[in-house]
Structures are given as C-alpha cells and as structure tokens.
Amino acid sequence: CTGWEVADHQALQAAREHLQKAGVEFEEGTPGELAERRVQELVRFRDPWDNVFELYHGITYESRPVVTPYAAKFVTGDQGLGHIVVPVLDDVEALRFYTEVLGFRLRDSMSMPGEFVGKEPGSKVWLRFLGVNPRHHSLAFLPMPNPSKCVHVMFEVDKLDDVGRALERVRKHGAPLSATLGRHMNDEMISFYVKSPGGFDVEFGTDGMTVDDSKWVARESTAVSYWGHVFGGQ
C-alpha cells in the first residue's frame, strides 16, 4: 500500500468525487487506521491491477528530526518519501489511469522490447515515470506481473558518501545486490539496488533531479543509465 498526501479536507473531498466520477471504488479509513497512521482522514482504493493506494491529509508531524544510526540525512520534505515502481498489465491503460484519474504528470518514458516482459517478439512496451512534486518521479510503472505488487522503492540521501557506506554494509552482510552502482539517465540519480526480504528491490541513491513543471517537457530516455547499474551483477 502506498500513501499520497493531499492538502486538506477539501482536497480529499475533491479526490473522492473524482474517484466516484471515474467509477473507482474506495473505502474510508477506520478510526484505528487513522490513529495508526496519525492522520485525520484517509481513503483507500485499488488501481485496475490491484495495487493499493491511500490518499490522506492532516498528518501529525514530529518536532524532533529523525536521526538514523548511521547519521544519513534523507531527502524528503516537499519531494515526499522517495519513489515506487508498481507492476501493471497494460501500459496504455495505466498511463490513462494515473494521469487522467489520479492527476499524475508524465515526466519521462522509456521503451523496452516486448519479449522482456513475456510479450511477442518485435513488440514494444513502455516504462513511464510520473510526478506529483519537485522530485523527477514519485511513481513509475512497468508492464510486467510481480507477486510482491512492487518492482522497487527508492530512498534518497543527501551525500554520495552515505550511498557508498550503505553499499559497503550491503556487501558486509551478504545482502543480494540487484544492480551495481550507477547513474540513471532520466533522473540522474547515483544509486545501487539491493533485494529486500519481501522480494522487491530497494534503490538507495543521491543527487536525484528535481523539476519545475512550468518548464519541464516530458522526454524519452534511450538507456537506463549513463554508466553502471549492471543488473544481476556484483
């Protein structure tokens, strides 16, 4: 389940009405769920591929900053927690749903051979990158089934040294590396990928791009990365 924050009660009510108009069923959060998440209101719904999302407002903020055991500072604030890549079955319908129903903005695209996701040879499928805040993308989708309902999640820190130290800990503890250190082409992030116990990948990186929607033009990337990111490599 992935949560998305809206401004206030009026914004959440507008989202309810928009979901109803689009024929998307949703349910209200229970008092226990509101207390657990420390929010004032939330609604929960599923996309056409059974990925679960929540919209909420009125989150309770701590007055003390989070200090991790390794003193890494995460890049959050108006960029949100990071990004998530979810599995879908139809990339055309997914683009329509996330942009027209949920209001995400297309930031970038990348085409892949259809056989990469089990489709007929010679066909093409699209990996799309969508945004709702200054972060280059907060949501992306890949037209490929995934039992965990998550392809990967990304967390960003503000220093390259913290990425390097995290990579050293991954190797020290024998966690399976899914992709080596590299710099992505679309959001320019320097990162690596590690396999989580839940079966999805965790991307850990720094130096991600931010965008200004008044000037941004959606693009197509022709490669995953400028360098590195050897998937399956150690």
Model-derived features with residue positions:
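N-terminal beta-strand motif that seeds the catalytic metal site of vicinal oxygen chelate
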Residues: 1-2, 58-93, 105-107, 148-155, ...
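Core segments of cupin and vicinal oxygen chelate
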Residues: 86-137
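Residue-level signal for secondary-structure boundary sites
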Residues: 10-12, 138, 163, 202, ...
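Vicinal oxygen chelate
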Residues: 1-77, 80-89, 116, 128-130, 145-171, 174-234, ...
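A compositional/structural signature marking long, glycine- and acidic/polar-rich segments
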Residues: 119-185
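A structural feature that tracks compact, well-ordered secondary-structure segments
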Residues: 1-3, 54-56, 96-99, 107, ...
